[in-house]
């Protein structure tokens, strides 16, 4: 249920600050958002998959913490990221 290498490369190119940037907050949030969206589609067909649902909740919590950090430290980058990803906060 992880993302393909091509999907990750596309996200890195779009949200990365440099060509080898894999750890910036924006990239981490974008990757988590893509995985969360993928899992949401999975749960539409596999309603009783509770083990994966726990993983989804961990990802959502991790993304929330990263977004809180970004909002606290660099509000302009936070607002741009929220708008680009279409998240509501």
Curated annotation (Swiss-Prot):
Pfam families: Ribosomal_S15
Keywords recorded for this protein, A-Z: Ribonucleoprotein, Ribosomal protein, RNA-binding, rRNA-binding
GO biological process: translation
Gene3D superfamilies: 6.10.250.3130, S15/NS1, RNA-binding
CDD domains in UniProt: Ribosomal_S15p_S13e
ATP-binding as UniProt keyword: no
A GO molecular-function descriptor: structural constituent of ribosome
Gene Ontology cellular component annotations, sorted alphabetically: cytosolic small ribosomal subunit
InterPro entries given in the database record: Ribosomal_uS15, Ribosomal_uS15_bac-type, uS15_NS1_RNA-bd_sf
Binding partners and assembly: Part of the 30S ribosomal subunit. Forms a bridge to the 50S subunit in the 70S ribosome, contacting the 23S rRNA.
Family membership noted in the UniProt record: Belongs to the universal ribosomal protein uS15 family.
Function: One of the primary rRNA binding proteins, it binds directly to 16S rRNA where it helps nucleate assembly of the platform of the 30S subunit by binding and bridging several RNA helices of the 16S rRNA.
Name of the protein this chain belongs to: Small ribosomal subunit protein uS15
Gene: rpsO
């Amino acid at each position: 249920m992880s993302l393909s290498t091509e999907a990750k490369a596309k996200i890195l190119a779009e949200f990365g600050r440099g060509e080898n940037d894999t750890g910036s907050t924006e990239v981490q949030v974008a990757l988590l958002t893509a995985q969360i969206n993928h899992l949401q589609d999975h749960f539409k067909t596999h309603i009783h998959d509770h083990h994966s649902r726990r993983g989804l909740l961990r990802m959502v919590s991790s993304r929330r913490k990263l977004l809180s950090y970004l909002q606290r430290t660099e509000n302009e980058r936070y607002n741009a990221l929220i708008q680009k990803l279409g998240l509501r906060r």
